[in-house]
Amino acid sequence: MQQRRKSVFASAPFAMKQAALGAGVAARRNGAPLSLAAVVFALFVFATFLYNEDIKSIADFPFGAGALRAKSPDLHVLQETVGAAHLAAGSIAKRGEEVIVRVLDAPASTAMAAAAGSSSNNSTIEVAKANANANANAADAGVKVDEGQERERDVTLPSVKEGGADEARRREDEEAAEKESSAKAAAATAALRTVVSVPDTCDLYRGNWVYDEVNAPVYKESQCEFLTEQVTCMRNGRRDDSYQKWRWQPTDCDLPRFDARLLLERLRNKRLMFVGDSLNRNQWESMVCLVQSVIPKGKKTLTKFVNGGNSNIFYAHEYNATVEFYWAPFLVESNSDNPQVHSVPDRVIQWHSIAKHAHNWLGVDYLIFNTYIWWLNTLDMKVLKGSFDQGATEYVEVDRPVAYKEVLKTWAKWVDRNIDPNRTTVFFMSMSPNHITPEAWGNYGGIKCAMETLPITNRTTSLDVGTDWRLYAGAQEVLQTFRRVPVHLVDITALSELRKDAHTSVHTLRQGKLLTPEQQSDPKTYADCIHWCLPGLPDTWNQFLYARIASAPWSSDQ
C-alpha cells in the first residue's frame, strides 16, 4: 500500500505529539496523574490530525477539478476556432481548392492538463498542481495569455467535392434546364409542324417572272459547298448575276417561300429521291443547296456514285433525312444507264424492263421522276428486241412519242403495283425546255442562249422554242391512268420556256472539264442551253415541290 503523504501543516504538531507522548509515559511511570494541560494538549493534537485529513481530501479532488475547469474556456475557444475553420474550408472546398487552416497550439500547461485527463490519480494531482500554479500566475498577470508560449501549426484540410445537398441541387438545376430546353425544342418543332396554305383554286403555274433583289436568290452560290462546276456560272466567269433574282409570281396567289427548316422537319427520318436524267440531277443539286443552308457543318454529308454508281446521297444527320438522286435517264433499262459513261450515240431502250432500277425506289417517301432530254437525240427511238442481260443487240425503231408513252406506261404500272400511297408521295416533272433557237424570241443574229441576260417578258404571241409538246401530251394521258397511287404533275415547261437567260451557256463543263477561254468564245459549238445555272431556275421548281409537300396534312406517324 502506498504510504499516505503528510500535510505540510502536520510536521510541527507531529514532533510536539511525540514529545508529549514521551512525557506522558514518563509521568505514568512515576505514577503521577494526568494534568489539565496534558488533556488540552491531546485535544489539540487530535484536531490537528483531522485537519490534515481534510487537506488530503481536497488535494485529491477539488484542486484537480478546479484546475481543469480553469482551463476549459481555452479549450472551448480552440474548438470554436477549428470549427469555424472547417466551415470556411467546406465553403472553399466546394470549389475544389485545398484548404489550409492555421491553428494555435495551446501553452505547455494546457497540454499538460489535456494529457492529465487520461492519467492516473497521482498524475492528475501533479497536473492539477501545475495548472493551479499556472492559473495563479495568469490571474496575477490579469488573465493574459503569453503569446510567446503559443506555437502555430498549419493543418491542411482535404479537398472535397460538392456535398450531397449541393449535388442534389445541381441535378435538380440540370433537370430543370433540360426540361426547359425540351419544352423549347417541342415548341419549335410544333411551330415547324405547320401546314402551308395553298388555295386549291390557285394555279401555281400561271403567272409572271418578277425581278426581286430583296428575296432572291434563296441561297448564294458561294455558300453551297455541294454545287458542281457544271452549274456554278459565276465562278466559271459569268459577269452578271441578274438571272438569280427573278421570282415566279402566280397570277391568283403567292408561291410559298421556301423554308428549309420546315421542309427538313417534314423529311425527318425520311427519304426524298429524284429519279431521271441530268435535268433531275440539276434539280437535285438545287434541293441540296436549299436545305443544307440551315444545317451546321459536320452534320451533313454528300456521297456520290453509290448503288453501283447510279446514286448520289445527301444526308442531314440531325434529321436522319436524305435527299437523293438516282440516275435512270429513260426510267426503264437502256444502254445509257452508266452515269459516268453515258455519252452513247446510238441510244437503245428496253421499254418494258424497269425492275433493275425500280427496286432502288422502294421505301422512299418522296419520289420525283423525270425523263425528257435523252429522247431528243433522234426522231425515232431504238427499242431492244430481247434483253440486255441475254446479250440481245437487235432493235426496232419506234416513233418518239409512241416509245415515250409506252415507257411511261411501264413506269406507271410499276408505281401503281409497288408504291404504298399511305407512305410515298409521287411527283412527275414535265419537260425542261432548251433554248437553241434565238429567233424564236426575236433575237435574230443571236447564237443559241449565249449572252442572254433577261427572261422573255410581255409576249402577246405564242412561244415556240422547240419543246416537243407531243411528249407532254403523252405524259398527261398516262398520269390519268393511275388507280391506287396519285401522281402529282409539276408543270414547269411553259414558265421555264421564258428563262432563256438562265442556262449555263459557256460557263460550264464539257466532258468533265471547264471550257477554256477559246471554247467560251465559240458559243455556237460549246454553249450549253440545256442545263441551268445555280442558284437559278431549278430553285423555283423546288418551290413547287415544297408547296405541295408542306401543304399536305401531317401523317399520323410524323
Curated annotation (Swiss-Prot):
Span of the annotated motif GDS motif: 276-278
Bilayer-spanning residue ranges: 31-51
Single GO BP term: xylan acetylation
InterPro entries per UniProt: TBL, TBL_C, TBL_N
Gene Ontology cellular-component annotations: Golgi apparatus; Golgi membrane
Disulfide pairings: 202-253, 224-289, 233-533, 449-529
The EC number(s) this enzyme carries: 2.3.1.-
Annotated coiled-coil segments of the chain: none
Record topology, Lumenal segments: 52-558
Cytoplasmic side: 1-30
Lineage: superkingdom: Eukaryota
Motif (DXXH motif): 528-531
Membrane topology qualifier: Single-pass type II membrane protein
Keywords: Disulfide bond, Glycoprotein, Golgi apparatus, Membrane, Signal-anchor, Transferase, Transmembrane, Transmembrane helix
Cited Pfam families: PC-Esterase (PF13839), PMR5N (PF14416)
Location(s) in or outside the cell: Golgi apparatus membrane
Active site: 278 (nucleophile), 528 (proton donor), 531 (proton acceptor)
Composition skew (Basic and acidic residues), residue ranges: 143-155, 163-182
Glycosylation site list: 122, 320, 422, 458
Family recorded in the similarity comment: Belongs to the PC-esterase family. TBL subfamily.
Record function comment: Xylan acetyltransferase required for 2-O- and 3-O-monoacetylation of xylosyl residues in xylan. Catalyzes the 2-O-acetylation of xylan, followed by nonenzymatic acetyl migration to the O-3 position, resulting in products that are monoacetylated at both O-2 and O-3 positions.
Protein name: Xylan O-acetyltransferase 6
Organism listed in the record: Oryza sativa subsp. japonica
Lineage, highest ranks first: Eukaryota, Viridiplantae, Streptophyta, Embryophyta, Tracheophyta
Gene: XOAT6
